[in-house]
Amino acid sequence: MALPNQQTVDYPSFKLVIVGDGGTGKTTFVKRHLTGEFEKKYEPTIGVEVHPLDFFTNCGKIRFYCWDTAGQEKFGGLRDGYYIHGQCAIIMFDVTARLTYKNVPTWHRDLCRVCENIPIVLCGNKVDVKNRQVKAKQVTFHRKKNLQYYEISAKSNYNFEKPFLYLARKLAGDANLHFVESPALAPPEVQIDIALQQRHENEILEAANQPLPDDDDDAFE
């Protein structure tokens, strides 16, 4: 969904809402996509920046109109106007800040209240930072709600495309859809320890085979 003053395109486009606590890296994540950053539009009535992010797939070009809150969530909840007509979503938390993960269920509830049945990706950001507070095996909310989960690092571009590819496949109803060209991304600002991150990714896979805990995602040791 484009804004009233924004050009529409003749290829599939979708409104993608990105939510999560302030400071989790939502804006940093969206700004990695250089053409989207260059063409963004500010909508003052809702207080949102909309970044048009184009991706090239084997079925043609698609666009996500990424709605970024511009930090309003720090002043209370987001207005329904932010969510209305949302066709897909990313919920982001910061793996170095436990509270941002504990608040994920609230963001999910707000999202589903307005948008109901849309594909949602949960993203744990800042996996490049060493002092991780939310361990990979502690992330279970996505399993309870049947969401996709990815560990990402916006500043290093690690896994940048994965949330978009998952959403594109769901929206197109085509599990074989794939990107044929990478978008132009800002150069990495940090490096990620790939070996360490691979261990975390393995933990996620192992945890997926374990029974779900009975807690409400807030029992951190």
Swiss-Prot record:
SUPFAM superfamilies: P-loop containing nucleoside triphosphate hydrolases. InterPro entries: P-loop_NTPase (IPR027417), Ran_GTPase (IPR002041), Small_GTP-bd (IPR005225), Small_GTPase (IPR001806). Residues 10-174 form the Small GTPase Ran-type domain. It is found in: Nucleus. GTP binds at residues 21-28, 71, 125-128, 153-155. Found in a nuclear export complex with RanGTP, exportin and pre-miRNA. This is GTP-binding nuclear protein Ran/TC4. It comes from Vicia faba (Broad bean).
